[in-house]
């Protein structure tokens, strides 16, 4: 998920069910919607310069759309990263995860993977990096099958803090298909983080207060 000019953009997954949607989060209205080919499993997205970049999981390809019309503008192939998981941008370049500890840095013009940084704590590497969000100069990343979000220095990959969202799962309706946290979007207008998960029936708005 990602906010762009006040609109919330969402990529959903599963083969045969993947979508790209634009939402008015205040009333849950769908402003635009496109279904992906049944051969694609939709993953992370980011919006830069009025273009939406959407990853697919194992297909080795990213999709490009016009942010206003959802017209398909093209696609790009992955390089050394073999899968598509999470995506964000800092206004100049794109950051991409592939399920490992690597955060790949893509040239915004050519979409080539130019280099990568690795996410590490003082105890070792942090693997299974998934959804990404650019927040005030830091990369927020959740880990696959975890309910926490790591705050990562984009220059050197150092984990500077971890946000624990496990209690949010207790606030959603319990059902057999309920899964873990898997979606977040930072709203720069309100400076709040919107958090949800796979098959959650709620979208939480969270304000992050730095520890003294």
Residue map of PLM features:
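Loop/turn-rich, solvent-exposed surfaces of beta-rich toroidal or solenoidal domains
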Residues: 124-158
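Short loop/turn segments that connect beta-strands within beta-propeller blades
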Residues: 23-28, 66-70, 107-111, 153-157, ...
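A short beta-strand motif characteristic of beta-propeller blades
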Residues: 29-36, 71-77, 113-124, 161-163, ...
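Blade-loop segments of beta-propeller domains
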Residues: 27-64, 70-81
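Conserved beta-strand positions in repeat-built beta-propeller and related beta-rich domains
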Residues: 10-14, 52-59, 96-100, 141-145, ...
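Hydrophobic, well-structured mid-protein blocks that either form specific transmembrane helices
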Residues: 62-122
